């Protein structure tokens, strides 16, 4: 179906606006995925703060022009689904990686984070980034373990001191 020039400009503007506010982007090939599965993906994406759109390659190239996601131009081949993470950098990568496990024909092509291209083979690095809450919990656990260890060492030093005095 041919798109009018106004429609193309609207799509480019919409995707460009999503790209400007996004933390990361993931590009995938959704050929062979059923409509029902894509609908489920879109619902899950909305719930996780991820913008998902199937875009023509030329429109996608124009939309990411001048953004941190220009490095994705090389993977804009074939049918292109682009997902932008708005709340957490790993949200889109995690979402599409999990979806690819369920759908054999769904293929992640690559991702971009802070202007750097991440090949599909390394998408786990982005998907495994902890959320803000998880990172805080890890920091608190580290601090808690460090203070507990310091307390134990202080008690051991006090014990050794008393044994030497006796």
Swiss-Prot record:
Q: Which UniProt keywords apply?
A: Ribonucleoprotein, Ribosomal protein, RNA-binding, rRNA-binding
Q: Which InterPro entries match?
A: Ribosomal_uL10, Ribosomal_uL10-like_sf, Ribosomal_uL10_bac, Ribosomal_uL10_bac_type, Ribosomal_uL10_CS_bac
Q: Which GO terms describe its molecular function?
A: large ribosomal subunit rRNA binding; structural constituent of ribosome
What Pfam families does this protein's entry cite?
Ribosomal_L10
For whether the record's keyword set contains Transport, the answer is: no
Which superkingdom, per the lineage? Bacteria
One record GO biological process: translation
Q: Provide GO CC annotations from the record.
A: large ribosomal subunit
- Specify the signal sequence span: none
Described by its record, this protein's role is as follows: Forms part of the ribosomal stalk, playing a central role in the interaction of the ribosome with GTP-bound translation factors.
- Quaternary form? Part of the ribosomal stalk of the 50S ribosomal subunit. The N-terminus interacts with L11 and the large rRNA to form the base of the stalk. The C-terminus forms an elongated spine to which L12 dimers bind in a sequential fashion forming a multimeric L10(L12)X complex.
List, alphabetically, the HAMAP family matched.
Ribosomal_uL10
Please give the PANTHER family that the UniProt record associates with this protein.
Answer: 39S RIBOSOMAL PROTEIN L10, MITOCHONDRIAL
**Stated family:** Belongs to the universal ribosomal protein uL10 family.
Descriptive protein name: Large ribosomal subunit protein uL10
What's the source species for this entry? Shewanella amazonensis (strain ATCC BAA-1098 / SB2B)
């Amino acid at each position: 179906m041919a798109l009018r020039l106004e429609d193309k400009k609207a799509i480019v503007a919409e995707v460009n606006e999503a790209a400007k506010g996004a933390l990361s982007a993931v590009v995938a090939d959704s050929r062979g995925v059923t409509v029902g599965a894509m609908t489920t993906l879109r619902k899950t994406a909305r719930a996780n703060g991820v913008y998902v759109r199937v875009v023509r390659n030329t429109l996608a190239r124009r939309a990411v022009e001048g953004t941190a996601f220009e490095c994705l131009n090389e993977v804009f081949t074939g049918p292109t689904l682009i997902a932008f993470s708005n709340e957490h950098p790993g949200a889109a990568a995690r979402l599409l990686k999990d979806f690819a496990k369920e759908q054999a024909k769904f293929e992640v092509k690559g991702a971009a984070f802070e202007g750097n291209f991440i090949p599909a083979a390394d998408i786990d690095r982005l998907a495994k980034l902890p959320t803000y809450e998880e990172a805080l919990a890890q920091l608190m656990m580290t601090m808690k373990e460090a203070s507990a260890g310091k307390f134990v060492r202080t008690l051991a030093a006090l014990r050794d001191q008393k044994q030497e005095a006796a």
